[in-house]
Amino acid sequence: MLEICLKLVGCKSKKGLSSSSSCYLEEALQRPVASDFEPQGLSEAARWNSKENLLAGPSENDPNLFVALYDFVASGDNTLSITKGEKLRVLGYNHNGEWCEAQTKNGQGWVPSNYITPVNSLEKHSWYHGPVSRNAAEYLLSSGINGSFLVRESESSPGQRSISLRYEGRVYHYRINTASDGKLYVSSESRFNTLAELVHHHSTVADGLITTLHYPAPKRNKPTVYGVSPNYDKWEMERTDITMKHKLGGGQYGEVYEGVWKKYSLTVAVKTLKEDTMEVEEFLKEAAVMKEIKHPNLVQLLGVCTREPPFYIITEFMTYGNLLDYLRECNRQEVNAVVLLYMATQISSAMEYLEKKNFIHRDLAARNCLVGENHLVKVADFGLSRLMTGDTYTAHAGAKFPIKWTAPESLAYNKFSIKSDVWAFGVLLWEIATYGMSPYPGIDLSQVYELLEKDYRMERPEGCPEKVYELMRACWQWNPSDRPSFAEIHQAFETMFQESSISDEVEKELGKQGVRGAVSTLLQAPELPTKTRTSRRAAEHRDTTDVPEMPHSKGQGESDPLDHEPAVSPLLPRKERGPPEGGLNEDERLLPKDKKTNLFSALIKKKKKTAPTPPKRSSSFREMDGQPERRGAGEEEGRDISNGALAFTPLDTADPAKSPKPSNGAGVPNGALRESGGSGFRSPHLWKKSSTLTSSRLATGEEEGGGSSSKRFLRSCSASCVPHGAKDTEWRSVTLPRDLQSTGRQFDSSTFGGHKSEKPALPRKRAGENRSDQVTRGTVTPPPRLVKKNEEAADEVFKDIMESSPGSSPPNLTPKPLRRQVTVAPASGLPHKEEAGKGSALGTPAAAEPVTPTSKAGSGAPGGTSKGPAEESRVRRHKHSSESPGRDKGKLSRLKPAPPPPPAASAGKAGGKPSQSPSQEAAGEAVLGAKTKATSLVDAVNSDAAKPSQPGEGLKKPVLPATPKPQSAKPSGTPISPAPVPSTLPSASSALAGDQPSSTAFIPLISTRVSLRKTRQPPERIASGAITKGVVLDSTEALCLAISRNSEQMASHSAVLEAGKNLYTFCVSYVDSIQQMRNKFAFREAINKLENNLRELQICPATAGSGPAATQDFSKLLSSVKEISDIVQR
């Protein structure tokens, strides 16, 4: 600045300026100068230039000469009051450098180090803001006028400076370049030696800028003072120093009050500890964490009172309370997109700091962030924070966590890392984008984890720019290692809108330029009614909604969709269509992202849809089973798959009643979200496939949706991501074979399987991996037409089953499945069948095996009889399965473990434990006991092996050729078909077993069906209360003994399978007895692992019995058994 003033005065040397330079400066700034500067602009520049040059003088190079940046009022302890712009000489610093002793003309004392700066630094200028992000600059200028500006240093590129200038409601950013000779310039024609000269020049002449630099943006927030006094090196405070005022809120462990620290007349926040809520040590851990962290966006600890109860934690006071309530109650025209992005950037900066300090927060959410003046946001509530000594932190048993904000690996394994905080940050970002909406609207807590497993993710909020939503989705990657770090997130915010402004992006998303206030309006009451109306329409025209909804939704809010948005908007509508069952169509608003509609309304719609959906889901399944004529049933199922894939309960949930519920409840809200997501994010070819399965109108709508599906995320946020072809076959096979209870279970697995092929990350998928493999084979590996065939076949099977009564249907359905099985070569057929069976039956191995030789004989007789449509479809499926065994095997090998990849450590430990096993004798006894408890797997396996040799085989083979090709095409490829056969009966599970190699036992027609039903029913009928912890533990011991015996004798592979089947059956029944949600999640994951391991053993029995290979397979099995045992014993 001094140089500028000298230039104005006409001096060529600093020394030429006398001690009365201030007079010269003011005169020079007020005096007209012969130049092309405008007098008005010069006078405006003088208003802020003259003050900043008050300290300029001969002593400018003195390193101890500083200038005050902010006002500071002394509060005792030898502190010194200073005013902005005042000169002072620094005499020394305290032990931590946070306070410095200074001398002014008013005296000597301590002042905060971050309140002063060297007199020759840029920070002394009101227009220089130091390291400030692009987003923060836009925020700081958001309330300015034309000509408001600031100069900032790039946070991402230190040393690189820019000018941010506001004009006509928009902020323009100009990079300050450095020439080879060291001179600075914005416009190459005008170069300057110093930054101050450059700023002064552009304050008088635009010279390439949109307008002149008139008004420096104020530095709004004073920096945090760490510690209330320079001598304050102990944290314990006197309780009498705090005056408690009114209550601000409460939490799990205590309450928060506003108080006054009398000694310093400072308003503070006082967090108290409830009596008997946790130990003092735990309470003090939070204070210990806060002592170690110092960041402008982290709430600062001031002291503690722990000498006697009640205990206090005293922190700085934030004027506007928690971020969640602030967002819900704020004026949305004031708290616009720029402010929201600024808030998110501040939080990411705080979390980046914690990441570098190796801290994890473990409770990051809008409710735990606080808001101060000028939209300052600080992360607070470190009650669950921990200093990391390794890559992960394991929470103690019984710890409580917010499910909707907790990463899946944390829910399943109690493992926390900075990556689990990243997941929570994604949810927090969604909260900010929706002005404080509750995450996963309409979805029950118990369903969140299952939906996430199925690759469901929340929809993009209305008006949310694509880049921001992509960042959310990146935070929600299933594998923790795939999520970005907070450093990357912060950098993403800094560079997110380099070529445009967020305001413009939001306007584009809303579909109307200049409608800035529309967002807040849309989010309010009117939306709810709209959603209701939408849902009604969707329900009334569910069959036709798929096609009309897309245009309809667009019409509502997308009247002027952007050219780049068409793909997105259709996707959103599609999602809405998915929800039609439960009123999901209400999501049409979501579809009009481009329109005014808000994410809130769409989510609310989904919620409403949820209530109707559960009933529809369950009713549709029942009707399908009992009413063959209901053609709509098939269509509904197809929709359910797309919408309700999420809804399907995991195989883990043994309770039949439970499985329907999840499918309903989850399916509706999730389905809505999912379908929309599915349509939006799925690829067009997948949509086409699915369309074939569903009614023609559905197909049309889906195809359209596929075309418009969103660009970046192939999978929808929801489970709907499952390939359509796969999903269709899956739901059919599942629904057909089992009653509602079993159906829910099987359905779930198959659906997941379909997902899995496309989305390897999904954990649940392993449970249905086999099934998924089958589905994927039909849909992915073969041409799309294969998928169609499968779909058609499934329809036929469905019809047959529905038409025939439980008694009559078995003969027709059974004979053909049996024939197919027989047709498969004994040796090769078994593996293929097993693969097919895997998907259909978890533990169905027993069901398949249960088919006795007698039943085989029975089947042989009926096998010769005329084939019903169901039989033919089954035969075709069987044929397809035999043809694609290689493919199936490959897929099986690729299957990922169901649980999230979270803590690798847990898996390693489990793997190591498998080596330990009880004595062989004990194992033998345990095996026997297990056999008595459930259908004997050994017999089933043996019978399966023997079956191929039986004459029934020959019959079966002829049957395959006899079936017309067109029909076989319909069933194309899903080995699942056997499962569908028993759909009307509980024996559905047995049908699944039939898919396995043991399926050769299917020779008996009616008798087989009966035996299968019996085999499957016992596990299904077991009341959850009947299976106790002891039963499960005994079963795990039995399996360990069987494995130990097998490893030594290299025999009795079937005994291991049988023991595993028994354990699986008991676990599925026991899962509902687990009360703690987190343990239930982990137990389901363990069941999925067990199921996958058993399938692998069934598919490749040879490897299990061959030396090292067998050991490896059993190691995985033992690992899952150990995990189950650990969870049960918690």
Curated annotation (Swiss-Prot):
It comes from Homo sapiens (Human). The modification Phosphotyrosine is found at Y70, Y115, Y128, Y139, Y172, Y185, Y215, Y226, Y253, Y257, Y393, Y413. The active site is at D363 (proton acceptor). This is Tyrosine-protein kinase ABL1. It is linked to Leukemia, chronic myeloid: A clonal myeloproliferative disorder of a pluripotent stem cell with a specific cytogenetic abnormality, the Philadelphia chromosome (Ph), involving myeloid, erythroid, megakaryocytic, B-lymphoid, and sometimes T-lymphoid cells, but not marrow fibroblasts. A chromosomal aberration involving ABL1 has been found in patients with chronic myeloid leukemia. Translocation t(9;22)(q34;q11) with BCR. The translocation produces a BCR-ABL found also in acute myeloid leukemia (AML) and acute lymphoblastic leukemia (ALL). Residues 537-566, 586-597, 620-640, 755-774, 788-802, 881-891 have a biased composition (Basic and acidic residues). Residues 953-1130 are annotated as: F-actin-binding. Non-receptor tyrosine-protein kinase that plays a role in many key processes linked to cell growth and survival such as cytoskeleton remodeling in response to extracellular stimuli, cell motility and adhesion, receptor endocytosis, autophagy, DNA damage response and apoptosis. Coordinates actin remodeling through tyrosine phosphorylation of proteins controlling cytoskeleton dynamics like WASF3 (involved in branch formation); ANXA1 (involved in membrane anchoring); DBN1, DBNL, CTTN, RAPH1 and ENAH (involved in signaling); or MAPT and PXN (microtubule-binding proteins). Residues 127-217 form the SH2 domain. The gene is ABL1. Residues 905-915, 984-993 have a biased composition (Low complexity). Widely expressed. The record marks E26, E27 as: Breakpoint for translocation to form BCR-ABL and NUP214-ABL1 fusion proteins. It is found in: Cytoplasm, Cytoskeleton; Nucleus; Mitochondrion. Acetylated at Lys-711 by EP300 which promotes the cytoplasmic translocation. Phosphorylation at Tyr-70 by members of the SRC family of kinases disrupts SH3 domain-based autoinhibitory interactions and intermolecular associations, such as that with ABI1, and also enhances kinase activity. Phosphorylation at Tyr-226 and Tyr-393 correlate with increased activity. DNA damage-induced activation of ABL1 requires the function of ATM and Ser-446 phosphorylation. Phosphorylation at Ser-569 has been attributed to a CDC2-associated kinase and is coupled to cell division. Phosphorylation at Ser-618 and Ser-619 by PAK2 increases binding to CRK and reduces binding to ABI1. Residues 518-996 are annotated as: Disordered. One of its GO terms (molecular function) is delta-catenin binding.
